[in-house]
């Protein structure tokens, strides 16, 4: 991923997910029109996220991207609500997973917040969970700030899973017994 520099003292990355979508959109326009569409055809519609962290009681509804740029304060707030709630450690979340969450919200067509089961996990928290057989990967995308486990109050887990899989933007894990869906911005796969 290409670096966007620092947002609020936190490094940001350009999400290849929407870039890939933009490329497909431009390719479709070229096929339909027969001409290369100028740059203004690329959508700069605002992207928003709504999150509730039941572990901390915090909630957030914010536009995190507008006018072609990530919004520093919004990204900082998202990073905080997605922090490791066991240790209060925060790290910059990958822009790709923010965009997955934003697209998932749009796909589900709901303004309600996602309930955050797990966002960033410190290496110590992840290792503790791994050693206690909690079903986490030893080298989890959560450690890299590239994954979020979530659920929705108004949408079934199946609806969330199907919507996430339809995006074709990363990993989607379905955990009905634990009542959450895992989304990440790694390779496209599902389980």
Language model region names:
Residues 37-41:
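Sec/Tat signal peptide C-region and signal peptidase I cleavage site
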Residues 7-34:
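N-terminal secretory signal peptides and thylakoid transit peptides that target proteins
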Residues 123-138:
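Charged, often glycine-rich, active-site loop that binds/positions anionic groups
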Residues 67-117:
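Active-site acidic/histidine clusters and adjacent loop/turn architecture
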Residues 81, 100-111, 132-135, 153, ...:
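Structured segments of extracytoplasmic/periplasmic soluble domains
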Residues 113-127:
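Acidic helix-start/capping segments at beta-turn-to-alpha-helix junctions
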Residues 2-4, 8-11, 42, 47-52, ...:
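Catalytic cores and adjacent binding grooves of peptidoglycan-active enzymes
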